């Protein structure tokens, strides 16, 4: 059975990806940082589908911990690698400190390259690497400057790896989601009324009149990991319900309410 490795796999989009790839027949290994309860729930969900599940605890900003987590996989080849994890400080660029920059790039870029360098030599010709980018790479999202730059770098690495690994039959592509209904998005506004109004505003501005769901992102990732996507290479696929076909005015009001919009 193929083995899929997912970073940030204990919640949100990462969890949906792990469960979808398990449904499609993959054994699952996933890296999580600290929520052991959530990780156990993902393991149980994967095993309920008849697939093996291995939760690997590691701080992706610590190379030694990443190496130790990968050691647990032994010599088992990884067929599918989904780089989903990210972390940053959400604040204006002029307020960023060196450690914010270092942490963001260590997790988004450093850990990604470390994992690819470790697993790619044993990846089979049908191997797949999928990176999860974000809408902040092509639209201003208040407080996301450092994360946006790291995700943009991740998209660049996606294209470079597509060229370098392509001759071996390994595909490398990126998914760039829009507004997806996860617990992390819900933290942008502190109170329930504000969150509800924010989501309603986004839904109203989206041609499909709906926020994205983690399972919809997972479905696109599953396609990219399938044989049907064997000729898809070095692409960034946008999955946003069409929300950015509109002028950005609908979101400005709500980003101002977060206190992150420039004054």
Stretches found by the model and what they are:
Residues 121, 163-167, 230:
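Alpha-helical segment proximal to the catalytic Tyr-Lys
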Residues 130-167, 179-180:
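Catalytic loop of short-chain dehydrogenase/reductase
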């Amino acid at each position: 059975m193929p083995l899929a490795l997912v970073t940030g796999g204990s919640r949100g989009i990462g969890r949906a990806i792990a469960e979808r790839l398990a449904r499609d027949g993959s054994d699952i290994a996933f890296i999580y940082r600290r929520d052991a309860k959530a990780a156990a729930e993902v393991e149980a969900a994967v095993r309920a589908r008849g697939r093996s599940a291995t939760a690997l605890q590691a701080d992706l900003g610590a190379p030694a911990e990443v190496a130790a987590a990968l050691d647990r996989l032994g010599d088992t080849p990884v067929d599918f690698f989904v780089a989903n994890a990210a972390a940053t400080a959400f604040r204006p660029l002029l307020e960023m400190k060196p450690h914010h920059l270092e942490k963001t790039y260590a997790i988004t870029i450093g850990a990604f390259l470390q994992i690819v360098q470790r697993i790619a030599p044993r990846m089979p010709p049908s191997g797949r690497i999928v990176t999860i980018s974000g809408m902040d790479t092509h639209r201003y999202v208040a407080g996301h400057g450092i994360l946006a730059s790291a995700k943009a770098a991740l998209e660049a690495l996606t294209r470079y790896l597509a060229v370098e690994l392509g001759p071996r039959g390994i595909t490398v592509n990126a998914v760039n989601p829009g507004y997806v209904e996860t617990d992390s998005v819900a933290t942008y506004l502190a109170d329930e009324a504000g969150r509800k109004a924010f989501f309603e505003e986004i839904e109203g501005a989206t041609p499909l009149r709906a926020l994205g769901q983690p399972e919809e992102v997972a479905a696109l990732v599953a396609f990219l990991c399938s044989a049907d996507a064997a000729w898809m290479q070095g692409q960034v696929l946008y999955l946003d319900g069409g929300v950015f076909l509109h002028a950005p005015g609908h979101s400005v009001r709500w980003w101002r309410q977060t206190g992150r919009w420039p004054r």
